[in-house]
C-alpha cells in the first residue's frame, strides 16, 4: 500500500498543508520543533486512530482551533481509497471511502504502518508496559478480531478492578458479581493470550534470520512470550478456559486483599534472548538496538504476509541513532518495496543508493517548503 497524498487541517502546528507523497522514500528535513514528527504522527494517527505520543486527542488540535482533520488517499493493488479523520474536543469521527465508521475496529487496518522512533530502541530494556503496547498496536492492525477482544477485555478488567477495590474496602461483601466477572474475564484473557503467543511465534520466525544477517551470523535471537496465566501444553481451548477459571478462583482471596486483578494479559511480558542470554539484563546497547531493528523489519514482513500489502514505514529521527551497518541493512531491506517517511535534521551521514531517488521536503514552522 502507498499513501499518495496527505492533507492536514489544524493538526498540531499545521494550519493547512497538502503533501504529495513519493511512492518510495520521502525525507522531511528541518530543525527541531518545526513539525517533522507531527507530520509522521498524523500518518500514524490516521492509521491507528490514536497517537503514539499522547492519549489526549485534544492535544492534536491546533491552538485556538475547533477541530483537526487528517485525510489520506491510499492506493492498493486493487485500487484507491480515501481515509478521513475528524478530531474535535468531544471525540473523533472516521471515514473509509467517504463512509463513516461507527466502530474503530471497523476502521483500523485499512492503513498499516510500522513506526521506528528512538524510543522504540527501548523495547528491549523498557518496561513490560512498553512491550505490551507494542504487541497490541501491531497485532491490532492485522486482526480486527483481536482489537475487539482487547476492547472487551479492557472493559471487563476495569469493572473487575472496581469491584475488587470495593470488596477490599468492605464496601461490598457479595462475591457473586466477582465470580460472574471472572467468567467473562477468563474468556477474553485466554483469547488474547493465545493470539499474542501465536503472533510472537510468527514474529520470531521472521526476526531470527534478519538478526542473524545483521550480525553476520554472530548472534542468535529468540523471543519468549511470558504470560501471567501459567497454562499447560493443552491445546483444547475449553480445557485451557477451565485452567484459567481455576487459577482465578484459587487466587480470589489474594486479589481481593490487593484490590486489583493480578493475573491476565495486562500483566504479561515479552522477553528477548541474544545468544541464549537475556538481552534486557545482559545485552549490550548494540545488541539491544540490533534486536529492536530486527523486530521492526520482521513486523514489515509479517504485515505483508497477513495483509498481502507492505505497510508504510515511518522513521522518526532514528537513522542518526543507528551505526552505518545497521543503517545500511535497514535501507537495503526496504528499498523498492516499502514506502517510507523519514524525519531528520540533515541528510549528511545517510549514505545509501536509496537517497538518490528520495523526495525531499523542508519543514519550517508548520509549513512545507519543497
Swiss-Prot record:
Binding-site positions, ATP: 30-37
GO biological process: DNA replication; DNA synthesis involved in DNA repair; double-strand break repair; SOS response
GO CC annotation: cytoplasm
Compartment(s) where it occurs, according to its Swiss-Prot or TrEMBL record: Cytoplasm
Keyword Ribosomal protein: no
Major localization listed first in the record, in broad terms: cytoplasm
Keywords of this entry: ATP-binding, Cytoplasm, DNA damage, DNA repair, DNA replication, DNA-binding, Nucleotide-binding, SOS response
Keyword match Transcription regulation: no
GO molecular function: ATP binding; single-stranded DNA binding
Gene3D superfamilies named in the record: P-loop containing nucleotide triphosphate hydrolases, RecF/RecN/SMC, N-terminal domain
The organism's place on the tree of life at top rank: Bacteria
SUPFAM superfamilies noted in UniProt: P-loop containing nucleoside triphosphate hydrolases
Family affiliation: Belongs to the RecF family.
NCBIfam families reported in the protein's UniProt record: recf
Role, per record: The RecF protein is involved in DNA metabolism; it is required for DNA replication and normal SOS inducibility. RecF binds preferentially to single-stranded, linear DNA. It also seems to bind ATP.
Protein name, per record: DNA replication and repair protein RecF
UniProt organism field: Staphylococcus carnosus (strain TM300)
